[in-house]
Regions:
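A short helix-loop-beta-strand connector motif used in the catalytic cores of GNAT acetyltransferases and
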Residues: 34-47, 51-54, 99
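Conserved beta-strand-loop-alpha-helix junction that forms the acyl-donor binding cleft
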Residues: 94, 100-119, 124, 132-133
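Short amphipathic alpha-helix that is part of the acyltransferase structural core
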Residues: 1-29
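Conserved beta-strand in the GNAT
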Residues: 45, 51-60, 66-69
Length: 148
């Protein structure tokens, strides 16, 4: 497994293929959001034997604060522990290099397994955001704080 800098083509390929869970597929209302994820040195892609496995990164919101994101291919299940560790290390590295003191994520409420994932990343639950999604689904706000 190797990590490479994220490219728009990686995200598009992941979305066109089978995802690890279809709940991971963004709502069509978001349109082509992939270019907004492109921030130099703030995203990466995991590749195994030439296959895209996952991509993750942090979208900067304002100074010191970013929003974490993740896209996993259907083959992520074969590498779930390795991917989890790589994503945690990668997000923490990005946060440190970019001087972020808050990294947050919005995780679907109807996908309870994501709470375990967020805890593994070192995040704490901050609350439920009702009708947050473009499709009016509820989301949970999770965040990692450094020095606050």
């Amino acid at each position: 497994m190797r990590l490479v800098p994220f490219e728009i083509a990686h995200g598009e390929a992941l979305l066109e293929a089978d995802l690890n869970d279809d709940r991971n597929r963004p709502a069509p209302e978001f349109g082509n959001f992939m270019p907004t994820l492109m921030h130099e040195d703030m995203a990466f892609t995991a590749i195994d034997n030439g296959y895209l496995v996952a991509a993750a990164g942090i979208f900067p919101l304002w100074e010191g604060v970013g929003e974490a994101w993740f896209l996993g291919a259907s083959r992520v299940g074969r590498h779930q522990f390795r991917i989890a560790k790589l994503v945690r290390e990668g997000l923490l590295r990005i946060a440190e290099e970019q001087g972020l003191w808050r990294v947050q994520a919005a995780l679907r409420s109807d996908w309870p397994e994501l709470a375990r994932w967020a805890r593994f990343l070192g995040m704490k639950h901050e609350g439920t955001m009702r009708c947050y999604g473009a499709n009016k689904l509820d989301y949970e706000r999770w965040a990692w704080l450094d020095g606050c």
